[in-house]
Amino acid sequence: MTYVIGSECVDVMDKSCVQECPVDCIYEGARMLYINPDECVDCGACKPACRVEAIYWEGDLPDDQHQHLGDNAAFFHQVLPGRVAPLGSPGGAAAVGPIGVDTPLVAAIPVECP
């Protein structure tokens, strides 16, 4: 089991969770952050740090957020648009930096005007 970042993060990316993660497993896409399920140690430090309440324990995902369980994993295991290989488990987000692209699910979410 792992923690999952849901749709509340899209176009917000508060990033307070990134600072709390002891294993640096929260990666930055273009519009959303993603938790690498293979690197997450399930400590839960990220959840209370998230100011927009976008982080869920896998077993507590609301029905309207279930698609993000697979989508968080897809960010690391599938070839993202514009890339030639899956990101995989690089061993920490800081060394990789912002990825600059999102999964097709997140990219398809309409941008809300302020």
Swiss-Prot record:
InterPro entries: 4Fe4S_Fe-S-bd, 7Fe_ferredoxin, FdxA_Actino, RnfB_subfamily
GO cellular component, one term: cytosol
PROSITE patterns assigned to the protein according to its UniProt record, in alphabetical order: 4FE4S_FER_2 (PS51379)
Residues in 4Fe-4S ferredoxin-type domain copies: 31-60
Binding site for [4Fe-4S] cluster: C21, C40, C43, C46
GO MF annotation list: 3 iron, 4 sulfur cluster binding; 4 iron, 4 sulfur cluster binding; electron transfer activity; metal ion binding
Keywords: 3Fe-4S, 4Fe-4S, Electron transport, Iron, Iron-sulfur, Metal-binding, Repeat, Transport
Names of required cofactors: [4Fe-4S] cluster; [3Fe-4S] cluster
GO BP field: response to host; response to hypoxia
Signal peptide segment: none
Amino-acid positions noted as binding [3Fe-4S] cluster in the UniProt annotation, renumbered to this chain: C9, C17, C50
Induction summary: A member of the dormancy regulon. Induced in response to reduced oxygen tension (hypoxia), low levels of nitric oxide (NO) and carbon monoxide (CO). It is hoped that this regulon will give insight into the latent, or dormant phase of infection. Induced in C57BL/6 mouse lungs 3 weeks after low dose aerosol infection with H37Rv bacteria.
UniProt KW Electron transport keyword: yes
Co-factor binding details: Binds 1 [4Fe-4S] cluster.
SUPFAM superfamilies from the UniProt entry: 4Fe-4S ferredoxins
Function: Ferredoxins are iron-sulfur proteins that transfer electrons in a wide variety of metabolic reactions.
Protein name (record): Ferredoxin
Organism of origin: Mycobacterium tuberculosis (strain ATCC 25618 / H37Rv)
